[in-house]
Structures are given as C-alpha cells and as structure tokens.
Amino acid sequence: MDLYGYVACALRLRYGVLDAFLNVYNPDELSAMDDTPFSLYLTRYDCTLETLRLFLKRGVDVNGVRGTRTSPLCTVLSNKELGKEAETLAMCLIDAGADVNARGADGRYPLLCLLENDRINTTSFVKYMIDRGTLVCVRGIDGCGPIQTYLRSKNVVLETLHVLVRAGASIHDMDKKYGFNILQCYMISHVRSSDVRILRFLAGQGVNSSQGFNATFMFDMLERKISYGVFNRKVLDFIFTQISVNQQDSLDFTPINYCVIHNDRRTFDYLLEKGANPNVVNFLGNSCLDLAVLNGNKYMTLRLLRKTITPDAYARALKVINYNIYSINSFGMREFVTRHRTMYKALIRSFIKDSDMEIYTYNHIYDFFKEFVDECIRERDAMKADVLDSVSMFDVIFGRVSRIRWKHVRVISKYVRGAYGDKVKKILRSLYTRRFKTNRLVHYITDLCGTSCLWTHLPVEVRYTIVDYLNDGEIHYLFMKLHA
C-alpha cells in the first residue's frame, strides 16, 4: 500500500504510520482521479492540526498542484465533517502561504466555500478572511456572489451580512436561473427560520423586484409557511407590508383559505385579527366556512361564525353537512357525523339566527336535527316578538343595539336554557361585571364627596344613570384615577 492508498482506505490515520509513508512517497503526486494524497487527506473526517503540520513539514504545495480539481483551502473549507476543526486547519494553511483568492479548476473560491459551510461561517472567521485580503466580488460556477451564497446556508447571522456589505459585496445580485433577488433567495432557503431583522435589512438596502412578481412571490412564500405550520408574527407583519391580507393568487385563494385547508390555527387567528375576509370565494366555489366544515375543524368553524357570514357561504357549508348526513350509511360517515355533531348544530343555530332562508330546503339536515331545528326557530321567533321599549330581545341579544342596559336582564334571562343560552349567559356575565364596577364607582364617589357635596343630594338612580353612560374603559380609568 502506498501513501494514496493509506489515506484513502485507513479507518483512522496514525501519526507514526503517516510519517513513515511521507518519508517515502510524494504527497503532491497526481493520481488518475485528478487528486493528490494531500488533497484526499483534506477530505477526511479525522484531519488534525498535527497531521496537517506533518504534511506541511514535508513541503506540500498549499495552493495545490496543477491538474487537481480544487485548491486545498477550498477542500478544507468545504469539509463539513470536520466541524469547527476546519477553521483551525484553514488558518494553518493560510499562515503557511495558501492563497485566499485561489480559484480551483472547478471554479470555486475559498470565500464562497466558507460561506456555504454553516459549521464555520461565523462572523469572526469571515472577518478573518476579509482581513487576509479575500475578494468579495467573486462569483461561483452558479453565478452566485458571496451574499447570495451565504443566505443559502443554514447559519445566517445579521452581523455577518453587515461585514460582507461593508467589505463591498454586492447585495443586488439576481438568481441566474429564476431571476430571484437576494431577499427572495433568503426566504426560499429559510421558509421555517426566517429572521425578520434580516428581511428588514435586505429590504432596507433597496432589494426589490417588479411589484407584480414580488406580490406573487410573497404570496407563494406565505402559502409555504402556512403549509409547514410555521408561525412568526413579526415575519407575517413584514410579508403583509408587501401584500394585502385579502390578496388572491391565480386560483383566487386568499391566505386565510390556505390556513383553513392546512388547519393552521395560529395564522388563521392572526389573519382574522388583521381583517381578512372569510367570505372570499375561490375558483372552486369554496369559502372559508365550507372548507372548515369539510375539514371537520370545529375551532375554525366556531371562530368564523362570530364573523359576518354571507348567505351564500352559509348555503355552501350547509350543503356539505346535508351531503354528509345523506352519506351516513357509507363507510365511516356515521362516526364522522356523530363526532362533529356539536359543530353542525352550532352552524345550524347561527344560520337560523342570521338568514331569512329556510332550513327546510336541506331535507337531510332537517330530518336528522328536527327537534333542534324546531327549537332554534321557535326561540328566534319568540325573541323577535319579545319587545321592550320598542326594542326586540333578538336585537338586544345579538348585538344590534348600541348598549345592553340593566333593565334587559330580567327579560333575556328566560332564554338562558334555550338553544341560544350560551350567548345569553355571556351577555349576563358581562352585565353583572359591569354592574359591579358601576356600583363600586358610585359608592367610591359618594364616600369621596361626603355629605355636603351636590353628588350626594342626587337621587341614587340618577347617580347610577350618570355612571352607566360611561363605557367600561372609562369606568376603570376613573376608578383608578380617584383611587390613586
């Protein structure tokens, strides 16, 4: 076995054996594979500073011999199996005279090899290379410059970007194949781990493309994040500075449509907070409500029912339920319908409340939920017929009056045990809480004013009426101000 064979085949290099081979064989002898024992050695996982110095002691060419595919420095910087040891070995080669700008026969440059190796592309090592005179205007065989190469690695740090930009690296390089700019390249490579500080930095450097292409790209990136279940509020805030929350793609899907399809609850809630329209219809004729029902997503369905839903959206969702009940004798459908019974009843209850359309047209729904449907209709009609001071209890309960007064408590309490009891209970809880705060403030003002003040001469009901005209925030603020 010669030196080349030993370096290629040994499970682990032994210092003494390697030293003996180096005394006999030339470490720069070119093989039929266009590499040398030295270049092959640098690809191993167990390179150490001691064995490298042994090669250097034997006068090995640190810039590589003519005919090799790449330079020794590029080989070390590309060897991820070495981990942090690659940094030490590279510094040793540079101290021994390796050219930091040597371009190998394969077209690679040391700086680009360093930047794509996420094990060692630290800010300090990049600074070290720049201080040693490495050029930052080089291009790889794929046409990518230093920043584009760095952004594709797994270890992207804002400080390193600052170092490269200050050194003169171009931030306006375009992807040669697809025409992506640097910002877009970063987002493609880091769908799961985008850093909003880097996004803002790149955008602040004037990185941009045509408005239409940028909007399409941002929408695609958002859809990928949703499909992966990645949620980062700051990154989403950045994306929605580029596109609208109701942006539609070529298939008329909006971001919230994709959230429902992929069951991404966090982004779904975020978009509703931002004012996304759940009633937008895609080219397949689906909106968020019927998609949520199709997926059996109870959480999203109940959240959507708190929003304003159009009659068409209700109709599509009810058709889904109607068909599911029709298919109840099919394999697995009875279990599916039973499991989502609560969700179906919530949708039916909301439809009867909001729509003038008849539920009876969905004959399978009516047959399956007959008692519940009749109860909802009876209660809705009773609320509309129950009037106090020209205001129906239906308008009071479902938020069609500016403010619910304490006088409504007795009337709406009789609906607590009905189909819409949960809504009534929520209203009563808020009224009792407000009553407590009002009562507390009235008594505190009375104690504060004493017996000689005009406030104490007012009738008690007038005092309560005055305080009751304040909203909850004003009552809390006034109490805290007086209590301070």
Swiss-Prot record:
Keywords: ANK repeat, Repeat. ANK repeats lie at residues 33-64, 68-102, 106-138, 142-173, 178-211, 251-280, 284-313. It comes from the Viruses. The keyword Repeat applies. SMART domains: ANK. Gene3D superfamilies: Ankyrin repeat-containing domain (1.25.40.20). This is Ankyrin repeat protein T5. It comes from Rabbit fibroma virus (strain Kasza) (RFV).
